[in-house]
Amino acid sequence: MADSYTLGIDCGGSKVMAQSVTYNSITGLVSPGDFQLEVNYSDSPKWNSKFIPVHLDLQRQEFSEGNIYLTQPEMDQGDVIVETIQDIISKSESDSIGLCFPGIKNDRGVVIMANGPRIPDLLERIQGIDSILHDSDCCVLGEWKSTIGKLQNCDNALYIGGGTGIADGIILMGKMIDFNSRDDVKRSWELKMPSGETIESCLSPKGMIEQWNLSQREKVKTLDQLSKNKNADTIFEKAAEAFLFLIQNRARFFKANHAKIEKIVIGQRLGIFMADSKLISLLESNTDIPLDYSTDRRTAALGAAWKRICS
């Protein structure tokens, strides 16, 4: 029995995905509704495709000191993101909205952002939004609490979503963990391999593409383009190493909490690419934990809608 309606909005590093849902109060799951809209920030003539975020160390310092000094490029880029969200909400005509966003948030906005502009006043600029959800959490919730999810009925599972960055998710003993409230587990952008590189820079689609473009004359824009180059094998091998490093780290976390990973779901652009690529064999040879690949890009929006309804 579908008895509730809301809109989920997933704000990524390069686009916004909005999806309406129906909620079933008996199963506790959401299902995709009729309204769906995906908008690239680059559709705006004001979008700066060459935007470079403020160095993370400086972002952390400014946040800890309570004084965030936005650069003009940050403000301009943030304006495009806010206008895109506002336009989507207007078209949806929904007054029940769940919105998720990458980066570190406080109760007003986005205060630390690895792959985009900080928007510390985001909440007050978007009508109808009373909180900003974590994108990683919503990716997991969309897989766990929607009728199209790959993590339904899982009690101990791992989610790895790859796009502009890496979306980390852990379900431990039937509950989704909060990375911000624990000191015994880190996100992929905080985890460094022996080489000094982060998991995120080696495993995310953006990271793999940047590695290639920094070292080659022939530039690529997608993982599909990258995979057609024989010289890219070393990049995919490094991604496999990063994956193994991450899985070993997570396995230790589960063991310390008296549990065992029963399933790993790889999603977002990384999941779509891997579902039909040679990277699968590299990853599957490194673990005996069952792997599944989520190719539906709506899951974070579905998770945001579920969170809005069930909070």
Task: Give the positions of each predicted feature.
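Short glycine-aspartate micro-motif
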Residues: 6-10, 96-98, 156-161, 265
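Conserved glycine-rich phosphate/nucleotide-binding loop
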Residues: 2, 285-311
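Glycine-rich phosphate-binding loop and adjoining helix at the ATP-binding site
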Residues: 45-55, 67-86, 90-156, 273-291
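Adenine-nucleotide phosphate-binding core of ATP-dependent small-molecule kinases
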Residues: 61-95, 209-273, 290-300
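Glycine/GP-enriched mid-protein hinge/lid loop-to-helix segment characteristic of carbohydrate kinases
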Residues: 5, 17-59, 128-133, 146-234, ...
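Conserved Rossmann-like nucleotide-cofactor binding loop
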Residues: 14
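Residue-level signal for short, function-critical loop segments
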Residues: 103, 163, 270
